[in-house]
UniProtKB/Swiss-Prot annotation:
Subcellular location per the Swiss-Prot or TrEMBL entry: Cytoplasm
Keyword Metal-binding: yes
Underlying gene: metG
Binding site for Zn(2+): 128, 131, 145, 148
Family the entry assigns: Belongs to the class-I aminoacyl-tRNA synthetase family. MetG type 2A subfamily.
A GO biological process held by the record: methionyl-tRNA aminoacylation
Annotated cofactor note: Binds 1 zinc ion per subunit.
Source lineage: Bacteria, Bacillati, Bacillota, Bacilli, Bacillales
This protein's UniProt keywords: Aminoacyl-tRNA synthetase, ATP-binding, Cytoplasm, Ligase, Metal-binding, Nucleotide-binding, Protein biosynthesis, RNA-binding, tRNA-binding, Zinc
Protein's recorded name: Methionine--tRNA ligase
Example GO molecular function: tRNA binding
Length: 649
């Protein structure tokens, strides 16, 4: 059976400078949608690219002493490298300087002139060079550009005009007959009230004051207005107007144009009218999302608040960034990036909720069943039943949210399942069940439910996180492709009996919030990594000791075999440790940071020759190493293959 198609586009980016995290936001969102649709079995066409013509580009190139083509070639290479680092799974990258695009734009313009939709006249009015936009006097805000707030220039020149007014009634009728065409709804009201109702004037679609652009056929002193040029990319990339237009016939009209709210006007007024004039179907939806802002407003170099996505990826990993962008901000609204919020999302959502759930599940399956996942035989208890029902309900919520492009809602649903699974461990207490042979079958059911819940989680995370789901599948021992597909979510309990788990590295190590916030802020300001802050912290150094003093400390590798809470001591945990044939009990003040069950199987470092001491009525026969500052905290651990009792030198 032939697959359904899904055509999704991002705006094509203007390569006048290095892209920041706000630009990455749109493309990551589009990538998540493209991956989701592929997961659902669609034949997806995901398009992105660059808008490389215009007066601003020409001026920037002149400032640098290079040709406009050299200027854009250099920046476009950086954009493509950024998309590679972000794992953007685009199917085509269109450049408006490519011949495949320019030839068709010339044909489109010539056709519109021939049929009388474009005519030659004279333009006198206001022009914003950064936005490449024309405005009437009444559209200006305090004399400045209504979109970016910068000063505008008064221009008077011969120009070709597009008869926008001819199509206004048809456009409003399309809005009425297709209520979901502009999303969110507030954007539609803005277009009608601010641009159409006041009277849509004919649009100047050529310039004569610069020459970096596609020339008007038969009148080369005119350059085609950059937005007419740029908007056509959505069909030129598909081969429209060529002998090889198979993709155009297959994918057009677009299912979704993803754009920032500042360019909704071009995509919901100029573009539909242009398509009407060409006799082509209109896109099904234009989604104008909000901006990713900083606390002090939009990102700008002058404010020193630009966040480089490459820096974030290199230090924290790609999935941490992708998760934050799509979880933190409701898509369609403005959102604020804060270093504190970013690090907290990593620590709480990714390291604690997800990472620890996987770690303790794998550790318990190894400990209680030799690493083999027990068979799923249906729910044994109300807790089992509730977990499996939650998983199915989360899939329903997730699907509804994704179809509405509510990415944060979809991720919230996944974390609802993760939270329910963590609670399930507390409810079933597998470490207690393991003490009674009569509870063996119930314990097996708990392990099977935990593994299956994590499999559901990994499947649902695939559109958002490009590396982590496969790491989860690997630790669960799942290699069968069918268990990673959407259709596998229709049945709970598909992991084959005896599938062997493989303990791996933590998905997301905990971070020191104070240090990492300083690091990000230093880079936002164009400074070096937060070495200065680290040096200040290290200034008050501890008293120096000799190597002989240090040699007196006996540090050994120990495995946590039985952790439990201390009665009447909120901050203390009682840990039974295996030091390689020797058992020790250690009381540790880590209860604020770790749940007992997530410590099972961890290889920690124990001070083995510390004099025993009594704490809250219990003997502590050593100390385990841990550390942190600024709100972050982590145990010192070693690789799993290091034998218990190994001396640390």
């Amino acid at each position: 059976m032939e697959k359904k198609t899904f055509y999704l586009t991002t705006p094509i980016y203007y390569p006048s400078d290095k892209l920041h995290i706000g630009h990455a936001y749109t493309t990551v969102a589009g990538d998540a949608m493209a991956r989701y649709k592929r997961l659902r079995g669609y034949d997806v066409m995901y398009l992105t690219g660059t808008d490389e013509h215009g007066q601003k580009i020409q001026r920037k190139a002149q400032e640098k002493g290079v040709t406009p083509q050299q200027y854009v070639d250099d920046i476009v290479a950086g954009i493509q490298e950024l998309w590679r680092k972000l794992d953007i799974s685009y199917d085509d990258f269109i450049r408006t300087t490519q011949e495949r695009h320019k030839k068709i734009v010339e044909k489109i313009f010539a056709r519109l002139v021939e049929q009388g939709d474009i005519y030659l006249g004279e333009y006198e009015g206001w022009y914003c060079t950064p936005c490449e936009s024309f405005y009437t006097e009444r559209q200006l805000v305090d004399g400045n550009c209504p979109d970016c707030g910068r000063p505008v220039e008064k221009v008077k020149e011969e120009s070709y005009f597009f008869r926008m007014s001819k199509y206004v009634d048809r456009l409003l009728q399309y809005y009425e007959e297709n209520p979901d065409f502009i999303q969110p709804e507030s954007r539609k009201n803005e277009m009608i009230n601010n641009f159409i109702k006041p009277g849509l004037e004919d649009l100047a679609v050529s310039r004569t004051t610069f020459d970096w652009g596609i020339k008007v056929p038969g009148d080369p002193k005119h350059v085609i207005y950059v937005w007419i040029d740029a908007l056509a990319n959505y069909i030129t990339a598909l081969g429209y107007g060529t002998d090889n237009d198979e993709k155009f016939r297959k994918y057009w009209p677009a299912d979704v144009h993803l754009v920032g709210k500042e360019i909704v006007r071009f995509h919901t007024i100029y573009w539909p009218i242009m398509l009407m004039a060409l006799g082509l179907p209109l896109p099904k939806k234009v989604f104008g999302h909000g901006w990713l802002l900083m606390k002090d407003g939009k990102m700008s170099k002058s404010k020193g608040n630009v966040v480089d996505p490459v820096m974030i990826i290199d230090r924290y990993g790609l999935d941490a960034l992708r998760y934050y962008l799509l979880r933190e901000v409701p898509f369609g609204s403005d959102g604020v990036f804060t270093p504190e919020g970013f690090i907290e999302r990593i620590n709480y959502d990714l390291a604690n909720d997800l990472g620890n759930l996987l770690h303790r599940t794998v550790a318990m399956i190894e400990k209680y069943f030799g690493g083999a996942i027990p068979p799923y035989r249906g729910p044994k208890t109300p807790f089992d039943r509730d977990l499996s029902e939650t998983a199915r309900e989360v899939v329903r919520q997730y699907e509804e949210a994704m179809e509405r492009m509510e990415f944060s809602v979809a991720l919230s649903a996944v974390w609802q399942l993760i939270g329910r699974t963590n609670k399930y461990i507390d409810e079933t207490q597998p470490w207690v069940l393991a003490k009674e042979e009569s509870k063996r079958e119930e314990l097996a059911s708990v392990m099977a439910h935990l593994a299956e819940s994590l499999r559901y989680t990994a499947v649902l995370l695939q559109p958002f996180l490009t590396r982590t789901p496969e790491r989860i599948f690997t630790q669960l021992g799942i290699s069968d492709r069918s268990l990673k597909e959407w259709d596998s979510l229709y049945d709970f309990g598909l992991i084959p009996e005896g599938t062997n788990v493989q303990k791996g590295e933590p998905l997301f190590p905990r971070l020191d919030i104070g240090v990492e916030v300083e690091y990000i802020k230093a880079h936002m300001q164009g400074g070096k990594p937060a070495e200065a802050a680290k040096e200040e912290k290290q200034a008050a150094r501890a008293e120096e000791i000799s190597i002989d003093d240090f040699a007196k400390v006996d540090l050994r590798v120990a495995e946590v075999v039985q952790p439990e809470r201390m009665k009447n001591a909120d901050k203390l945990l009682k840990l039974q440790l295996d030091l390689g044939g020797e058992k020790r009990q250690v009381i540790s003040g880590i209860a604020e940071f770790y749940k007992p069950e997530e410590l099972i199987g961890k290889k920690v470092i124990c001070v083995a020759n510390l004099k025993p001491a009594k704490l809250r009525g219990e003997w502590s026969e050593g100390m385990i190493l841990a550390g942190g500052s600024g709100g972050g905290f982590s145990l010192a651990t070693v690789d799993q293959h290091v034998p218990n009792g190994t001396k640390i030198k």
